[in-house]
Swiss-Prot record:
It comes from Maricaulis maris (strain MCS10) (Caulobacter maris). This is Recombination protein RecR. Residues 83-178 form the Toprim domain. InterPro entries: DNA_Rcmb_RecR, Rcmb_RecR, Rcmb_RecR_Znf, TOPRIM_dom, TOPRIM_RecR. It comes from the Bacteria. Belongs to the RecR family.
Length: 201
């Protein structure tokens, strides 16, 4: 969407901003105008932070997390449990689990999920490294923390089959009622999963 009275530099800025998740042409235009109106307070510091991140941040060669160090701070932490590896789709999922503080083992970022529609195949994901890691002597459990989508569950089944001979326990996150959730507002699939995952009180 071309912006009237905007030069090529502004058009390029808007075009690049529009490529970010959740930003369409209108939102990108508003963001660009906001940045241009706050050059010293926001635009220049943001440009410096982006350049710094582009130069210094890389994917961890062990788990796939994003960090300035390799291995990342999570992999390098001596107090993490080596017996369990939690498999996630994205780095954002890893960060969400870390915020929750519920998992104390190691992580593995796949970099996506299998998808026939999007043409994502096993060789497009970080699966070979996962199989290598799961074969290590100290690993006894692989936790599949993938999204409850068709592609996520297809990927989980593929991984379970692929690692069947690795002599590890393969588990997945429980599905069901979220903390603070009301039954009347939950979808049918979530309610059905909650019943299947019910436990003794």
């Amino acid at each position: 969407m071309k912006t009237a009275s905007a030069g090529p530099e502004i058009e390029r800025l808007i075009s690049l901003l529009a490529k970010l998740p959740g930003l369409g042409p209108r939102s990108a235009r508003r963001a660009a105008l906001n940045l241009l109106g706050k050059k010293d307070a926001l635009m220049r510091p943001l440009a410096e932070a982006l350049a710094d991140a582009a130069d210094k941040i890389r994917a961890c060669s062990e788990c796939g997390n994003m960090d300035v160090s390799d291995p990342c701070t999570v992999c390098a932490a001596p107090n993490r449990l080596d017996a369990a590896i939690c498999v996630v789709e994205t780095v954002g999922d890893l960060w969400a689990l870390e915020r929750a503080g519920a998992f104390k083992g190691r992580y593995h970022v796949l970099g996506g999920v299998l998808s026939a529609l999007d043409g994502v195949r096993p060789e497009d994901l970080n699966i070979t490294k996962l199989v290598e890691r799961s074969a290590r002597e100290e690993v006894s459990e692989i936790v599949l923390a993938l999204n409850a989508t068709v592609d996520g569950q297809t990927t989980a089944h593929y991984l379970a089959d692929r690692m069947a001979g690795c002599n590890v326990s393969i588990t997945s996150l429980a599905r069901g009622v979220p903390v603070g959730g009301e039954l009347d507002y939950l979808d049918d699939g979530t309610l059905a999963a909650a019943f299947r995952s019910r436990s003794t009180v």
